[in-house]
A protein has these predicted regions:
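C-type cytochrome heme-c attachment and multiheme electron-transfer modules
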Residues: 9-15, 19-45, 49-207
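Bacterial N-terminal signal peptides that target proteins for export
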Residues: 1-9
Length: 207
């Protein structure tokens, strides 16, 4: 009979190698932040820490980065049936804690960071999200019916093995991470599925 100790070691090894695979997928990418001041060359520490993490953040494990306190201008349109625009929530707020430019890249581990040490170029989205795909809204069967141009997330295939609801939504909400995988740059820009011939767009939009 296999001992509990061996089973435990096997489980630990599985977690270790899974973590290693994730780390390898971001090495050398735009999310490899090992050159940020104060990291000591560590890739993950800007966002995650094994000790003394921010316990107020539940959307990502062992969170280590200061979160944005900005107020955002959200997307709105006469054709958008997702309800009044909400401020970014869930994992999207964590993404924006670097990408809105209000929080220093090296503001992690309880430190305030270096003023002006912010993300730049096309990655700097800012606080005006009115010209970006809407986020942090409920995408459910009722919205699909009301809109008439959206796939039913409870039934439509995500292209990732399950339904849109199961694979791409977070507590039923559309977020940045619905389309982007922060840890995998295989399909730029960190897309979860290919958008060749607008395939990703057409996952949700019936056009």
């Amino acid at each position: 009979m296999i001992s509990k100790k061996l089973i435990g070691l096997a489980a630990f090894a599985g977690l270790f190698f899974a973590g290693t695979a994730s780390a390898q997928s971001i090495v050398g990418t735009d999310h490899d932040l090992s050159t940020v001041q104060g990291t000591g060359g560590e890739i993950c520490v800007v966002c995650h820490t094994p000790h003394n993490s921010d316990t107020t953040v539940s959307e990502a494990p062992l969170w280590n980065h200061e979160t944005t306190a900005a107020t955002f201008t959200m997307y709105t349109s006469p054709t958008f049936d997702g309800g009044p625009p909400n401020q970014p929530g869930g994992a999207s707020k964590l993404c924006l804690s670097c990408h809105d430019g209000t929080v220093a890249l090296d503001a992690f581990g309880g430190g305030g960071g270096t003023p002006g040490n912010i993300i730049g170029g096309g990655a700097l989205i800012g606080t005006d999200l009115s010209n970006d795909h809407p986020i942090s809204f409920i995408y459910d069967s009722a919205l699909a019916t009301t809109d008439g141009g959206l796939a039913d997330p409870s039934a439509a295939n995500s292209g990732l093995g399950g339904t849109i609801d199961a694979d791409m939504l977070f507590a039923g909400n559309m977020e940045c991470a619905s389309c982007h995988d922060v840890h995998d740059s295989t399909i730029e820009p960190f897309l979860r599925v290919s958008n060749a011939a607008s395939a990703m767009c057409l996952t949700c939009h019936n056009k």
